[in-house]
Structures are given as C-alpha cells and as structure tokens.
From Swiss-Prot:
The keyword Glycoprotein does not apply. It is found in: Cytoplasm. One of its GO terms (biological process) is DNA recombination. One of its GO terms (cellular component) is cytoplasm. This is Crossover junction endodeoxyribonuclease RuvC. Keywords: Cytoplasm, DNA damage, DNA recombination, DNA repair, DNA-binding, Endonuclease, Hydrolase, Magnesium, Metal-binding, Nuclease. Mg(2+) 1 binds at D8, D139. Mg(2+) 2 binds at E67. It catalyses: Endonucleolytic cleavage at a junction such as a reciprocal single-stranded crossover between two homologous DNA duplexes (Holliday junction).
Amino acid sequence: MAIILGVDPGSRITGYGVIQCQGRQQIYLGSGCIRTSADDLPQRLQQIYAGLCEIITQYKPDEFAIERVFMAKNADSALKLGQARGAAIVAATCAGLPVAEYSATQIKSAVVGTGRAQKTQVQHMIKQLLKLPASPQADAADALGVAICHFHTYQSLIAMGGKASSRTYGRYK
C-alpha cells in the first residue's frame, strides 16, 4: 500500500486527507476541504464528486477510505450525509479505487486510543503523528484520521500474518 485518500463526508464541507505509507511510517502529502457553494443539493453533490475527482487525479491514491454514516437525530441531515458519501464513493469507484469504511469510534481509537475522543484531541494527535507544524482544520483532521485508521487496520492484519487486501479489511458493506 502506498497512498491512502481518507474522506470525512459532509453535504456542505467534505474533508480530505492524503498520506503515503512506507513500511510502518505515515507521511503527510496533503489535506483540505471541499466547500460546496450551491444551495441546491444536487449541485453540492456534483461539487463533492468533481472536487474528489481532482484530488484523485492530483495524488493518484491506491486506496480510498471513508467515514461510515452515523445515526443523526435529524433524519434529513443523515440522508444528506448519506448522499454526500455516495458522491464520494462514486468518485473513488470511477477511478478504480477500492473503498473501505470505518466508524467514527474506530477512527478515534486508531488515532487517539479511545473511541470517545474529542475533535481537538484528534486534531492534536494528527499533528503529532504526521509531524505537522500546526493542527489541521477539523474536517481535514478527521479525513486524515480516516486514512490513518485504514493504514493501522492494514498493518494489524499484516502483523497477524493475514493477507491484507481491501477486500478483507474495512470493506464497504
């Protein structure tokens, strides 16, 4: 595994983070946010798709990992989040990338050591793990956390003597 694109989906702001993996080392390549400008949901979904297609073209990742949808108190928000995830997943599959998904608890555990970590704790640990000069913005930090979680899951399978492939870990269900 060489380059992982992690995505924290949102209908207004979608975070992305790209890391390169060399052995057990994680190297920061880039991160940021796709901020949608349209009020119309279909236009926002198109902006997410197009933005991720550009990022995939720029970084040429080998793996794609995304945060799993959680149950929100507001059903409308959960549906919009699911649609944003769909746009992101389509961008990945159109580029031929395998898709893996992880829950927020799995991501926080991989980055901070506890699934109940606060956003500020995640940002701080991302800064430390990737040796960044400053903490990334929240959505980008979450996306980097997704990529790190994917890498750690891969490393764990290898350490246990298993054959790691996108088909056997974090796979999309």
